[in-house]
């Protein structure tokens, strides 16, 4: 070691005597001994119990030892912290007698050192669990001290605000609301910066309580409030999510109250209402689908506050008009936006909304105009633009009326848009980023294949879609349940079966024609897409994702269905499969508690009147429907599509079976329930004779322990998977009678609809709906008699319904041509006089004009 002399220099003697030495590094062959360092275990890993396999004894024992070690360390740390606190208190007492200047110096040094320590630790350093538990100011760091002082339950603050990713301020607001001081004395600026700006995701109740406390803090003097506070309150109320229509209307009512209170504030203070306030109000009115509130807010801000809505406001209004099906107003507002100013010029979002309006109207011409206009004005097209345009053209190709005879051309152009999405890297990226876009694309492709009658492509799409959904929901179930828990396949299938996609598949079955060539096979790119999709599906289930489930989609193991009978059978199997939650129930089985005649007797004994009996029966039916039948699939829209399949494939027996099994007459149900109640009260129960509604196979399925249930019980049980007939069902039945030339079916339908017109279900319709329904059914009756060459009967229907039906020539065109073909000029003339007759108002106007005044 070298020493320094008096002047700080090295001693020369030592330098001369020092020997030079060379340090040789160790050879690489020599292995150094590794240090034995204790592994540091993260607190999160210690407390994580979800990853433990409780069936593994060693793993469980290891976790127990780990938790014991963690508890011991935590106890020592608490003891050490308490000792430090005690020493700190003693030092503070000693420093009270020390010179104040020295105390200030120590305090400043402490501040500097603490700031240096903070810099060393870094801003991202996380506190462990023990530090948070030992901190005396944990609640004050989560909540301002002036608020935490008013909340007695300190544990509540930690429970609600400890997890920063999932904070719940609703209990905090409730606790403040029930406290003694509430928000008194805090000041508006503190309330805005520390409460309104920080407390998010509040419920309607919490926001109402907060609003009440704010008004209380200012002595109910609204003039002490400011624009920022009103804006934040309105935005918070508009973000409230309420599943009920009444809840949404309550939000609008609260916003209206705030605007009226703001009027009082504006009379004493000068601030300008903002666009955010307007958008919050009209957004809430749009969610509530309320014309009254929408009209009030628009007039309030434009007239009272002299504010011009911006493009975002107008976009919300257009969306509201679209939801309310007032498409004419949406088009008028869209056209006016083009001429207001450059700031109001429609952007991509507005154009996409108008393409959705084109979908609703099935107006392909306007869709093409909108698409071309975007090119002319250099408006950016995004993925949604192409999807909306493609779907609009697909829906417009539904029939020759909406497509104007250009159905195939519209489908071809729609497929071109879909190919554009796949070919464009930017659009493909948008497609993969948002799962919702994938759904829209798949839905558009299903619409195209359904209207085109491309059963092969539609089957492949439906199979892949349902299989993918089942897989996702299956693994989601496994993620949140143990391996020993039984898999709830009913719940999984209920989530996986889509009513909309199933309806499009049924529509493709109904459009099936063996001789028809799908549009996709008309050009190379389409053929390649169709071939790759169809051959990527294995209907035998070898590549399915159903795991341990023995149930899979009942689809024939064929890439193409080339026969109408196969189509009928597969549609019937899929229909039952969807209704039975993936085959986990049998809709023909007797429910629990209703196996014998005695079960009905017990219900009758409990009911004093026939109305009580009907009520109890209705409650039982509601329970059965919710438990045993998937009524997400069994709706009127899907049922009509299901009934249309045998009509278009010309299978009259199949249609009658489907109609009988899945529909019932409401008036007939009431009659049978009343009749059964009277017979049961007189102890004259029906003999166990099978109903005509059930064949031998059905009755065998319903036999319980060798006892055949009564006819009424069978009828009652079948109600759980039946829908009451309405105007649409009677119209479908008449179309079937026309297609099958079935006189008996036509007369039965006519008679039953006459009884239906006397029921409450028909009388509850609006006068316009009743008149439209009568006109449609009368037109179908005329068409039936015309096809059967019963021309006088057809003419009689027209003449007898002059008061209720406004007959147009397009409605009787086939009858007029038939009358001319048989040279019945008198009947043809009478028919023309009916369709050419003028209303009384028009006749009166013409008479006034003809007067020579």
Curated annotation (Swiss-Prot):
User: What family does this chain come from, according to its entry?
Assistant: Belongs to the CCM1 family.
Mind telling me which Gene3D superfamilies this protein's record contains?
A: Tetratricopeptide repeat domain (1.25.40.10)
Q: Which residues form a coiled coil?
A: none
Known function: Regulates mitochondrial small subunit maturation by controlling 15S rRNA 5'-end processing. Localizes to the 5' precursor of the 15S rRNA in a position that is subsequently occupied by mS47 in the mature yeast mtSSU. Uses structure and sequence-specific RNA recognition, binding to a single-stranded region of the precursor and specifically recognizing bases -6 to -1. The exchange of Ccm1 for mS47 is coupled to the irreversible removal of precursor rRNA that is accompanied by conformational changes of the mitoribosomal proteins uS5m and mS26.
Question: Chief localization class?
Answer: mitochondrion
Q: Quote the protein name from its UniProt record.
A: Mitochondrial 15S rRNA processing factor CCM1
Listed GO CC annotations: mitochondrion
Record localization: Mitochondrion
Specify the superkingdom: Eukaryota
Miscellaneous note of the record: Involved in mitochondrial-nuclear incompatibility, a major determinant in reproductive isolation between species, through hybrid incompatibility of Ccm1 and its interacting partner 15S rRNA between yeast species.
This protein's gene is called CCM1
Which region of this protein is its transit peptide? 1-25
Task: Report the InterPro entries cross-referenced here.
Answer: Pentatricopeptide_rpt, TPR-like_helical_dom_sf
